[in-house]
Every structure is written in C-alpha cells, then in structure tokens.
C-alpha cells in the first residue's frame, strides 16, 4: 500500500525524518491559528490532494486538520483521532459545538485514553467513539549527541515537550533550583528560554532534537508536568527505556503511570 502524509508548512525536522517510502504533500495554508482566508484555502488544497491520490483511508488528527479534513473528505473513508480532548473541553471550550457538529462526518472517532473517551461521551460526542492507546517504535539509541556536561550530576531528570504554559516549564525550573546536585534537561524548546529569568546552573534547555525519546537512555528519571494531556507519547517512550516517571495526574496519564509502581 501507499502512504501519503499531509502537513502544513512541511519545513520542520520531523518532516525531514519521514521515510522516503512515504509520499509527502504540503498544504501551506493548513495552520494552527484561526484565519477564514487560510482555512478556506486549506480546504481547497486538501480537496486537490484528495483528488490526486484518491485514498482508501484518511486518518485525521486533532485539532485543525481534524476539523477541516472532516469538511472535505468522505465520511466513510475518514477516521479521526483526538489527541487530548481536554484541549477543547477545558482550554478551548468555544470549539466544542464544532466538534459536536462534525462528529458524524467520519466513520470513527478514536480517543487515546479511557479518560478522553469518557469525557467525549459526557459532552455528547458519542458517534462510533472508542479508545485505542498510543503506540511507539522503541527509540533508536545508536546515534545520540554527547552531553558530557551531564556526567557531573548525581542523577539526570529529563523532560521532552514544547515550551508553552500547558507544559509548566516554570515548575520544571523551580524543581531544578531545589535539587542543585541533579541535572535537569529539557528537550523541545525552539528558541532560547529567557522569559523565566536566569536559569539555575543545573537546568539545561537544549533545543529541538530529532529522535528526542532516545535520550531517555541517558537519564535517570522522566518528568512531565502539564495542565492537560491525552496520552503522552514521551511518557510511553520513557517507560520503554525503563525510566521511572513523575508526571501530572491529567488526561490518561494515570492509565499508564501507576503510583509507587512505575512512577508518581
């Protein structure tokens, strides 16, 4: 079978990592922010891509692609995965009517945790909803960037996330200040982190690194603080490396992190 991957700008590191066997399609106007002009142009671009490939199955992911895609693609060929329903239910509740309206514009809605499925149903989104947990390929640890500065610490605490309020980076920094003998490493920042004042000497924001999950092999503990989640892939990657996990009890996290057993 052939696989076609559609993305917005298509200029990030993840785009370059996609297998050569995958057909890559740009949809330049598919953007995170709301814009009537860009969204209408994205719908037109998605229609052209659909006609070009005539796919048997269309797998849509939240949020923007899930909305526009359900407007464009045939219902019977479309599956929609919700990666963390709290991003709508709590953080952007004004979009809830749109999700309700479009729920029948796909053949199935996939929640990534029982928590999300339960909340989808409680909010009236009940059409062919089921839970399928996220899966991963175990990260390849053969070609990792050296971080010799971490060897001086008793333990290394790793977090992998975008730097945004949802992910509570200030809490990560505050914990680092409390434990100066431990090294704290954050992978995922796109630019220098300056908005939280001077970082403690043991706190390192190292940027957006390809194959980030593989660096769990160089850590002693994985930490993910967050206001809301679906079922974080980074936690699953950390667990695949045998790391204990300290994470906020949000979304489906407690379905995989068992307190006092494999984390806290």
Indicate residue ranges for each PLM-predicted region.
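N-terminal strand-loop element at the rim of the active site
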Residues: 1-38, 119-121, 129-131, 190-192
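Glycosyltransferase donor-sugar binding loop
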Residues: 5-12, 136, 160-164, 183-195, ...
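Donor nucleotide-sugar binding/catalytic pocket of nucleotide-sugar-dependent glycosyltransferases
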Residues: 25-26, 104-143
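Acidic anion/phosphate-binding donor-loop and adjacent secondary structure
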Residues: 34-37, 90, 121-122, 135-153
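Short His-centered aromatic/hydrophobic patch
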Residues: 60-66, 82
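A conserved mid-protein helix/loop that constitutes part of the nucleotide-sugar donor-binding site
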Residues: 155, 159-178
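Aromatic "clamp/platform" in nucleotide-sugar-dependent glycosyltransferases that forms part
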Residues: 208, 227
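Short hydrophobic beta-strand element within catalytic cores of glycosyltransferases
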Residues: 235, 244-247, 257
């Amino acid at each position: 079978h052939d696989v076609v991957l559609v993305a917005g700008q298509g200029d990030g590191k993840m785009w370059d990592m996609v297998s050569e066997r995958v057909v890559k399609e740009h949809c330049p106007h598919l953007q995170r922010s709301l814009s009537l002009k860009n969204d209408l142009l994205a719908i037109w671009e998605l229609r052209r891509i659909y006609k070009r490939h005539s796919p048997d199955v269309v797998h849509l992911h939240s949020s923007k692609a899930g909305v526009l895609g359900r407007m464009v693609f045939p219902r019977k060929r479309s599956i929609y995965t919700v990666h963390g329903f709290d991003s709508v239910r709590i953080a952007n509740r004004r979009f809830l009517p749109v999700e309700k309206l479009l729920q029948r514009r796909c053949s199935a809605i996939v929640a990534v945790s029982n928590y999300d499925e339960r909340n989808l149903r409680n909010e009236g989104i009940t059409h062919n909803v089921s839970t399928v947990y996220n899966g991963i390929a175990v990260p390849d640890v053969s070609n990792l960037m050296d971080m010799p500065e971490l060897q001086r610490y008793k333990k290394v605490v790793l977090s992998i996330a975008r730097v945004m309020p949802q992910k509570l980076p200030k809490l990560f920094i505050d914990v680092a200040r409390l434990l100066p003998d431990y090294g704290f490493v954050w992978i995922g920042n796109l630019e220098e982190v300056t908005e939280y004042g001077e970082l403690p000497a043991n706190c390192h924001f190292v940027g957006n690194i390809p194959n980030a999950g593989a660096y769990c092999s160089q850590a002693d503990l994985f930490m993910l603080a967050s206001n809301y989640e679906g079922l974080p892939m980074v936690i699953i990657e950390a667990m695949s490396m045998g790391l204990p996990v300290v994470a906020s009890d949000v979304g489906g996290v407690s379905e995989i992190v068992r307190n006092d057993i494999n984390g806290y």
